[in-house]
């Protein structure tokens, strides 16, 4: 049996001024689903990075579109961000991108390329497909229980 979900689809021009619309839409959807504030903030950064990457690299001189699909499941939100622009070799880039190396001076940090590392760090799962253009599928699971239910209550009174 196929898992039930609801789908929201959007298309925006691949311009920086429209990225905020996607970020706000995602935050509203995630809030309705019951995501924690910190998880929503993480997803806002991840979706901004994915869209900004398209704006900066996908279409060169042409103005294209960014397609966004939100898959709302009972336990997770899947976000697909896609373009039909210029693709790149993700596996090659992934080998070059990684966590900050504390032994290197800050002047040697790359100015770009950390977007995919950030997305990978902030989301629970990420898949990237590239053919004609690029598709990034990001998944974040809802963390409903933040505290163990059978723990002992904390008292504010001192015992003597």
Curated annotation (Swiss-Prot):
GO terms for molecular function: ATP binding; protein serine kinase activity; protein serine/threonine kinase activity; sigma factor antagonist activity. InterPro entries: Anti-sigma-factor_SerPK (IPR050267), HATPase_C_sf (IPR036890), RsbW (IPR010193). The keyword Magnesium does not apply. Negative regulator of sigma-B activity. Phosphorylates and inactivates its specific antagonist protein, RsbV. Upon phosphorylation of RsbV, RsbW is released and binds to sigma-B, thereby blocking its ability to form an RNA polymerase holoenzyme (E-sigma-B). The keyword ATP-binding applies. It comes from the Bacteria. Signal peptide: none annotated. This is Serine-protein kinase RsbW. Transmembrane segments: none annotated. Its EC number is 2.7.11.1. It comes from Bacillus cereus (strain ATCC 14579 / DSM 31 / CCUG 7414 / JCM 2152 / NBRC 15305 / NCIMB 9373 / NCTC 2599 / NRRL B-3711). Belongs to the anti-sigma-factor family. PANTHER family: ANTI-SIGMA-F FACTOR RSBW-RELATED, SERINE-PROTEIN KINASE RSBW. It catalyses: L-seryl-[protein] + ATP = O-phospho-L-seryl-[protein] + ADP + H(+); L-threonyl-[protein] + ATP = O-phospho-L-threonyl-[protein] + ADP + H(+). Keywords: ATP-binding, Kinase, Nucleotide-binding, Serine/threonine-protein kinase, Transferase. Pfam families: HATPase_c_2. GO terms for biological process: negative regulation of DNA-templated transcription.
